[in-house]
Amino acid sequence: MNHIKDQIRCGAAYRLGLTGKGIGVAVLDTGIFLHRDFDSRVTGFADMVNGKNFAYDDCGHGTHICGIIGGSGRMSGGRYSGIAPGCDLVMVKVLDRKGNGYSSDVLAGISWILERKEKLGIRILNISVGACSKRGMSENSALVKGVNRAWDAGLVVVVAAGNNGPRTMSITTPGISRKVITVGCSDDDREVLVGGNRMVDYSGRGPTAACICKPDLVAPGCSVVSCSSRADKYTIKSGTSMSTPIVSGAVALLLERFPDCLLYTSPSPRDMRRS
C-alpha cells in the first residue's frame, strides 16, 4: 500500500494531518472480518444475504476492500495502512461466499444505507460490485436507478468499472451511470500482470451504450496487499475492485479537509476528479 500512496501523492494530505476521521464510508460487498487494523471503526453492519446480525466475511473480498479504504496498518507496523486510516466503515453484505449476489440485495443494501446515513455519518458509498448481463446494461436498470438515488441523496458513489476489458462497452452495471464516479484499474508503474504505465487490459472500458465516456478515473489495482479475513493477516488481490476503494479513501480525505464542499451542490464525477 505504501507505493500506491506514493503514486497518488497521499503525502500532501497526510502532512495536513488528514486521515479521513469523522467520515463514514459505506461498502456493499461480501462482509467484513473484524481485523485489528479496523480498530473500533466498524460502526455498522447489515447482512442482506444470510440475515446474520454480527460482522463476518465468508469470502474475503469485502475485508480486503475495507482495508484499502481505511485499514490502520496496525498489524504490519503501518506498512499496509489504507488510504484513509481514520475513517469509519459501514459494511452491508450483499454478496455470498463465492462473491455472487442478486441485484435485489444490492438495492436493499442501498436503501439500508440511505435510511442510516445521517446516524452513521455516511458520506461515501463504495461499490466494488458489477453485473454484466445485457438486461442490466440500460441506464433505466434498477441498479443504475439505485446508485443514482444514493448520489442524489448526497452520497459520493464510487463504483468499479469491472474486469471485462479490453473490449469497448465493457463497463459493468451500475458503473454505466453517468452520475457516479466509475473507476478503472491502472498498473501503477509496476511490472505486474502487464508492463508499462497504462490501464490494465482487463479493466472495463467505455463508452457506455448511451455513449457516455467511462471510466471517470483509473487508480492502481494490481497486486494490492490489504487485510485478510483469516486472522489478522494480509493478502494480495488485483482488479478494479481494488482500484475503487483507493478513490473512496481519497474522497474521504477530501471531505475531511472540506466537509461542506458537497452540501450545497451536486457535483458531477468530473467535478470530483478535478478536486
What do these predicted regions represent?
Residues 1-24, 37, 136, 193, ...:
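Protease zymogen maturation seam
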Residues 14-26, 32-44, 52-104, 120-123, ...:
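Subtilisin-like serine protease catalytic core
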Residues 29, 175-256:
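Extracellular S/T/G-rich loop segment that most often corresponds to the catalytic His/Ser-adjacent loop
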Residues 31-33, 130-132, 162-166, 188, ...:
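Catalytic metal-binding/acid-base residues of hydrolase active sites
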Residues 64-68, 108, 245-253:
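Short amphipathic alpha-helical face segments that pack within enzyme cores
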Residues 90, 156-158, 182-183, 225:
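Structural detector of well-ordered beta-strand residues that form the stable sheet scaffold
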Residues 94-179, 209-212, 230-238, 242-243:
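Substrate-binding/access-modulating region of protease and related hydrolase catalytic domains
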Residues 264-275:
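Single conserved hydrophobic/aromatic residue that forms the stacking wall/gate
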